[in-house]
Amino acid sequence: MTLPVNPVDNLAALIRCPSVTPAEGGALTALEKMLKLMGFSANRPVFSDDNTPDIENLYARKSGNGPHLMFAGHTDVVPPGDEKDWKHPPFAAAIEDGVMYGRGAVDMKGGIACFVAAVARHIEKHGNIKGSISFLITGDEEGPAVNGTVKLLEWAKQRGESWDASIVGEPTNPNALGDMIKIGRRGSLSGTITVHGVQGHAAYPHLAENPVRGIVTLVDSLLYPAFDEGTANFQASNLEVTTIDVGNKATNVIPNKATASFNIRFNDTWTAESLQAEIISRLERAARDNRLRQGRETPIKYELTWRERPSHVFLTHDEKLIGTLTASVEAVTGKRPELSTSGGTSDARFIKDYCPVVEFGLTGQTMHMVDERVALADLEGLTQIYERFIADFFG
């Protein structure tokens, strides 16, 4: 029996599966085959929810006496766009000059391929693991993230599963392998403000009520002053206005409604609830401030709706997990990785409610891009890091 010790072969098998969210595309089947060669038991639960596609997931475990390490990630990928723009077909796993091309090469089929290879090498060298390893893999990370990791964790918990630590194999390194380990993530909160006015002719503003004035005033209250100046482990919270729309194509008509959407990435100064309260307070003050209403006699009439479920800020403090991974990275790459909380959200935001979690994978320079690719040397390097980590974690 040949174990899946080669990360290049593993990744090629996964890339050749066109698993664009929500399609499984054969990727979980390919992964399950690799894991069963190593004695893992596997389950493939499918989760559903209103107004979202059904999603197939995978949970596989190889049990032993000792701590339980979870590797988490996703096999779904974003669409490749126009395939004619690619140097090589996005699902061909073509190799040229020591580089493999393909959608998901770094985000994040590459990380999965390397961890599989690392486990296989450990088993080949040492026999059974002194503990348990599980793979918690979803097909719903790049999509709504409703029928994926969040439900798979609860499904596993209900069946008696618990974990001592987790690694998420997202591409964490900005420039080179070994740059960065993610030990936490900022929270994320999104909302939409709608201001109602009275439609009218632009030449007769006294007969209308322009909602654009109101939306500008309210948005400005969220941009200034800054929410905070950052903390010891997190950069300053940052709000970005992502859309402003009046739905009006005529230049001589005052619209009757204006909307603005925003997203704020926030640090551990705030909880989602305290930040929502701060935003509401700012909007209320601005809506009622005579100095800001530009002659309006009544407060600005607006509605605030929260979009999506907020992601909560978190920071991992587990010294064994962080220290062991840091030492493994340094031993293989020769450099000490930065411990960071930068970047966007990931499924680690769900895992942190079950066990300590960190993120470490390949470099992210080409993720979601045309010609997404990974150096074969990086696949070998990451496999060696994971293999060393597994050996040291289980001692």
UniProtKB/Swiss-Prot annotation:
Pathway: Amino-acid biosynthesis; L-lysine biosynthesis via DAP pathway; LL-2,6-diaminopimelate from (S)-tetrahydrodipicolinate (succinylase route): step 3/3. Binds 2 Zn(2+) or Co(2+) ions per subunit. One of its GO terms (biological process) is lysine biosynthetic process via diaminopimelate. GO terms for molecular function: acetylornithine deacetylase activity; cobalt ion binding; succinyl-diaminopimelate desuccinylase activity; zinc ion binding. Keywords: Amino-acid biosynthesis, Cobalt, Diaminopimelate biosynthesis, Hydrolase, Lysine biosynthesis, Metal-binding, Zinc. Its EC number is 3.5.1.18. Zn(2+) 1 binds at residues 74, 107, 170. Zn(2+) 2 binds at residues 107, 142, 368. It catalyses: N-succinyl-(2S,6S)-2,6-diaminopimelate + H2O = (2S,6S)-2,6-diaminopimelate + succinate. It comes from the Bacteria. The active site is at residues 76, 141. InterPro entries: ArgE/DapE_CS, Bact_exopeptidase_dim_dom, DapE_proteobac, Peptidase_M20, Peptidase_M20_dimer, Peptidase_M20A. PROSITE patterns: ARGE_DAPE_CPG2_1, ARGE_DAPE_CPG2_2. It holds the Pfam family Peptidase_M20. NCBIfam families: dapE_proteo, PRK13009.1. Belongs to the peptidase M20A family. DapE subfamily. Catalyzes the hydrolysis of N-succinyl-L,L-diaminopimelic acid (SDAP), forming succinate and LL-2,6-diaminopimelate (DAP), an intermediate involved in the bacterial biosynthesis of lysine and meso-diaminopimelic acid, an essential component of bacterial cell walls. This is Succinyl-diaminopimelate desuccinylase. The gene is dapE.
